Curated annotation (Swiss-Prot):
An annotated GO cellular component: cytosolic large ribosomal subunit
UniProt record similarity statement: Belongs to the universal ribosomal protein uL6 family.
Entry-linked InterPro entries: Ribosomal_uL6-like (IPR000702), Ribosomal_uL6-like_a/b-dom_sf (IPR036789), Ribosomal_uL6_a/b-dom (IPR020040), Ribosomal_uL6_bac-type (IPR019906)
Job of this protein: This protein binds to the 23S rRNA, and is important in its secondary structure. It is located near the subunit interface in the base of the L7/L12 stalk, and near the tRNA binding site of the peptidyltransferase center.
Gene label: rplF
Organism: Chlorobium luteolum (strain DSM 273 / BCRC 81028 / 2530) (Pelodictyon luteolum)
Protein's name according to its UniProt entry: Large ribosomal subunit protein uL6
Length: 179
């Protein structure tokens, strides 16, 4: 039995879960999320909790058990509280600003980089060196954060670039001067 899969998920009174035609739909105060479902697992709702159960004991069913438990858990958390990723920009002259619905990044290239957020993602810049990405879909928030980070990954010698909040960049020593 999957240690993660067998744990019940508390719904709370804000979220509502529905399974119809092989699609899981979770509705909450922040929005609605859908997820296609595989045949190897089923979702049972009882007294304010959701249980993900597997149909048989095949290798694929065991793999899907824990996966779908976490997918449903993330959907419930997304529609009730949402997800946020914070990016920090380090480097002289590196900055970010919002221009209407575009994120304008100055990252030491000869041109500015403009990034438009996909549907369901909200971006804001509280200051010039911080970008906040928020939304209800955890995977999409992480994907957008990774895309923005890929424009200028942190380099190990000076630490310049875009990094996640709390990310530790392993620093390297530069070339030693010869005798």
């Amino acid at each position: 039995m999957s240690r993660i899969g067998k744990m019940p998920i508390a719904i709370g009174n804000e979220a509502k879960i529905e399974v119809k035609g092989g699609i899981i739909t979770v509705t909450g105060p922040k929005g609605v999320l859908d997820q296609p479902m595989v045949e190897e697992v089923r979702i049972v709702e009882e007294d304010g909790k959701v249980l993900v159960q597997r149909i048989n004991d095949s290798k694929r069913a065991r793999a899907m058990h824990g996966l779908y438990r976490m997918l449903v858990s993330n959907m419930i958390q997304g529609v009730t509280t949402g997800f946020t990723r914070k990016l920090e920009i380090a480097g002289v002259g590196f900055r970010a600003e919002m221009k209407s619905d575009l994120l304008a990044l100055t990252l030491g290239y000869s041109h500015m980089i403009y990034f438009k957020a996909p549907e369901g993602i909200k971006m804001e810049t509280p200051d010039q060196v911080t970008v906040l990405i928020s939304g209800i879909d955890k995977a999409l928030v992480g994907q957008v954060a990774a895309k923005i980070r890929s424009f200028r990954k942190p380099e190990p010698y000076r630490g310049k670039g875009i990094k996640y909040e709390g990310e530790i960049i392993r620093r390297k020593e530069g070339k030693a001067a010869g005798k």
